Amino acid sequence: MHILVVSVNYRTAPVEFREKLTFQAAELERAMTTLQNQKSVLENVIVSTCNRTEIYAVVDQLHTGRYYIKKFLADWFQLEIEEVAPYLTIFEQDGAIDHLFRVTCGLDSMVVGETQILGQIKDSFLEAQQVKATGTIFNELFKQVITLAKRAHSETTIGESAMSVSYAAVELGKKIFGELTDCHVLILGAGKMGELALQNLYGSGARKVTVMNRTLSKAEVMAEKYMGHAKPLSELQCALLEADILISSTGASDYVITKEMMTKVEKMRSGRPLFMVDIAVPRDIDPAIDELEGSFLYDIDDLQGVVEANRAERLKEAEKIQFMIEEEIVLFKTWLSTLGVVPLISALRDKALAIQSETMESLERKIPNLSDRERKVISKHTKSIINQLLKDPILVAKEIAAEEGADEKLALFAKIFDLEMEDVESRAEEVEHKRAWTPSVPSL
């Protein structure tokens, strides 16, 4: 079994390409189900955000797994593998495990230490569980990763100086306008990104706020929380006439604001500038609008400069979290190494229980007048003796499994206890067969 990550992210691909490889929320479960049926893929979780699309997979062979995951991405987005490959980063084994920990803890984010990615990873994992795309390995790994990420944010101050991308957009607006009290702010999109932007705007003094969304009721709910106004998207052109700051994150598949629309709006704005931030992927605003004299457009990649402002302080805390990650990886790898010894332990227990059962049958033949209570007491105590005798050998077997040359040592272990290796290997095959269909872990 091998753990593999295939990543397209803000470090390796511009937004123009990332938006071509973005899974919509509604299609994520279908995508993971499709990927699960690909050759070599045993488990998978797909994470798709504005800054990254990543496939986490357990595969039976690294080379085969890499190829079929690349092919899946290309086929799904109707591209050629040659078009996709230059933008992919691939992590394998320890590197893949470390990458997942770092991403979930916010250490690989554009804004180091942001917490939004933790929720996105958790949501993707739970969706993968629902479609039975995860098994023994990922159920354990993702549970461990999510738990550590929560602990990292509670035990360090990285979140205090960290910013989400939406917060970075607000900071950029403050640098341009100074105080936001008198600015008319227009929010397009009532999703998580839009609400995060509105929270930060409100916290920075903005009070003239309009929220627009395709579903007006959602815009009304969000606007009411922050004493703003809600309008339907059909009134967008009029709203653009009044706005000073526009932050857009609708999740639409096409441009919500076109250059043609903005050209008409500019003529009626009497030279007033409009600061526009597009934090959607795919983008909501036609990038050609930046050519217009009165429109100042920034997309998600342009926010990198704002993000750097608090970077030094966050990196100090990131070092602490990286140390926590390394400790956790050791624990996971130790657990992973013991999976191979499970069939051996199972065979040892079964042999011991068979001896106990034969002993009880012999005892009952020799002492036929035992009461039910006496049988239960004797059975309980003989099983207790077995458990105590097996406790140390089982611990030793688990320790051996984590050492170099484990196969030879475990073979000797099996020989000492006269265990049939064919039986052990048969049990191992059953474990591998069932691994991808392990019941979901409890909700995190």
Curated annotation (Swiss-Prot):
GO biological process: protoporphyrinogen IX biosynthetic process
Signal peptide: none
Record: residues binding NADP(+): G189, A190, G191, K192, M193, G194
A Pfam family that the UniProt record links to this protein: Shikimate_DH
Highest taxon above the source species: Bacteria
Family matches, as InterPro entries: 4pyrrol_synth_GluRdtase (IPR000343), 4pyrrol_synth_GluRdtase_dimer (IPR015896), 4pyrrol_synth_GluRdtase_N (IPR015895), GluRdtase_CS (IPR018214), GluRdtase_dimer_dom_sf (IPR036453), GluRdtase_N_sf (IPR036343), NAD(P)-bd_dom_sf (IPR036291), Shikm_DH/Glu-tRNA_Rdtase (IPR006151)
Binding site for substrate: T49, C50, N51, R52, S109, E114, T115, Q116, Q120
Residues with site note (Important for activity): H99
Family: Belongs to the glutamyl-tRNA reductase family.
Domain statement: Possesses an unusual extended V-shaped dimeric structure with each monomer consisting of three distinct domains arranged along a curved 'spinal' alpha-helix. The N-terminal catalytic domain specifically recognizes the glutamate moiety of the substrate. The second domain is the NADPH-binding domain, and the third C-terminal domain is responsible for dimerization.
Function: Catalyzes the NADPH-dependent reduction of glutamyl-tRNA(Glu) to glutamate 1-semialdehyde (GSA).
Record text on subunit structure and interactions: Homodimer.
Miscellaneous remark of the record: During catalysis, the active site Cys acts as a nucleophile attacking the alpha-carbonyl group of tRNA-bound glutamate with the formation of a thioester intermediate between enzyme and glutamate, and the concomitant release of tRNA(Glu). The thioester intermediate is finally reduced by direct hydride transfer from NADPH, to form the product GSA.
Protein name: Glutamyl-tRNA reductase
Organism annotation: Bacillus cereus (strain 03BB102)
High-level lineage: Bacteria, Bacillati, Bacillota, Bacilli, Bacillales
